[in-house]
Amino acid sequence: MRKTLLEKKAYVKRTLSLFILIFCSIVTSQAQSKEITVMVSPDKADCLYTENEPCTFTIRVFKAQNELKDVTVDYELGPIEYPAEKKTNQPLKNGKLEVKGRMSVPGFLRCKVTAHVNGRDYSGLATVGYAPEKIKPVTDMPKDFKTYWDSTLDKARQTELNPTMVLLPERCTDKVNVYHVSFQNVRPGSRTYGILCIPKKEGKYPALLRVPGAGIRPYNGDVYTASQGAITLEIGIHGIPVTMTQSFYNNLFNGALKNYWQINNTDRDAFYYNRVIAGCIRAVDFLCSLEQFDNKTLGVAGSSQGGALSVITAALDKRVTFYAPLMPGMCDHLAYLEKRAGGWPHYLSQSTEVKEAVKNVCKYYDVVNFAKFLTVPGWFSWGYNDETCPPTSMQAAYNTITSPKELHIYPQDGHFWYDEQAEEWSNWIWKQLNIN
C-alpha cells in the first residue's frame, strides 16, 4: 500500500525527533532561537564559484526581522579554520557591510561574523565552495589497509554471534514486533546492542541498518519503516544495552566513556573504533542470519559519526546494496597537516600537538580510504556551514568514490538538517528498499 503524503511527513518528523538526540549528548542545552539574527549572504545563491572568482559577502543584523543600522561587527574571512583576514569593530553602513574574498585553489571560503548588540554577542556565518569537485584528500592509504581490515574481520568472525532477542511488548504494534537484541562482535562477551523491528506478516523482507551519530543514548528503533515492509536494526556502538534511561548514558559519557573517540587512538588494534567497525559488520551478519531477510536488499544509513560508519560498512561488506550518509564525520583526518580543515573528531587539528602514532592510526580509520572500495549506490547530503564536519573534509572523501553516487547540498545547513533534507533522505532509502 502506498503511503500518503501525510504519513510520509509524519514519519519525517518522527525521524527528526529520533536523530536530534545525536547532538544532545555533546551540545549543552540552549535556546533554539534568538531575537537577534546575524545574516551573512554570498552574492551567488548556489554558493559555488570557480577558482579566483571574486565573492562578496553582505553582512546584516536583524532584530525581530527588522534591519539594525547602528551595529558593529567582527569578522574572519578565509579557508575554513584558517582565516586569512580578521577585522574588529567594523560599523555597518546603512545597515550592511560588504566583505570581498576569493580562493585560487579548490576549497571552501568562510566568512564568520560576531555582532555586538546591547552588550551581547551574536554570531552568523556563510561558506562558499570554490571548485569543490576538484578537492583531493590529503590522507594517504597504508599499503596494508585492505589486508588489515580483511584480517580484522576474519578474526572477529571467529567469535560466534550468539544472539539474544528479547521482545518488547510495549513497543510492538499491530504490524511490527520490536526486540531488544544483542550479539557478540570481536571476542566472547563483547556485544553489540540494538533495537530490531520485524514485520509481523509472514514473508521475506529487505533490511536497513541504522548506525548512530556520536554520543551515548537509548534507541527506539525504526518502527515506521518496518511497518511499511522492511526489517530495521538500529544499533548502539558502546557495548551496553540501549533501553536504559538517558541519565544512565549521561553518567557514562561524562565518566568512563568521556571523549570515547580518543580512546587508544595511538594503537591501531586497540583503538575504540576498531570494535565499533567490526560491530557494524557483525550487525550485517546478524541481519543476514534472520529467516525473514530476503537475502537481496540491505542498506545502511546514519549521520555524522553514523554517516562515516555507513560508508565504512558499505565499503567492507559486499552484502550491503546501498548506503545513505548525512554529513559524514571521520573524513580526511590528515588534511590539517596541509593547513586545511579535516573531519570530526579533528585528531590532528591546528590546536593539537601532532603525534606520529595518532597520524598513522588515523589512516586506517579514515572514510577517504574506505570510500575507494565502494561499489554500490550512495546518497550523500550536507551543508557548507557545518562547523563540526567541515565540507572540505566530506567533499574530499566524496570525490574519491567511483561507484554510483548522489550529492544533495543544502548550502546554509550546519551540523543539523532541514525537514526537506530529511524527507529527501528518507524517500531515497525507501525507494532502495522498494517500500515507497
Task: Indicate where each model-derived feature is located.
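N-terminal cap/lid segment of alpha/beta-hydrolase-fold proteins
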Residues: 43, 161-201
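Cap/lid segment of the alpha/beta-hydrolase catalytic domain
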Residues: 217-278, 335-342
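Gly/Ser-rich "nucleophile elbow"/oxyanion-hole loop immediately N-terminal to the catalytic nucleophile
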Residues: 259-299, 303
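Hydrolase active-site cap/lid region
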Residues: 307-354, 409, 417-420
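Short beta-strand/loop motif that positions the catalytic acidic residue
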Residues: 374, 380-382
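Short alpha-helix in the alpha/beta-hydrolase fold that links the catalytic acid
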Residues: 376, 390-398
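C-terminal catalytic histidine-bearing segment of alpha/beta-hydrolase fold enzymes
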Residues: 395-436
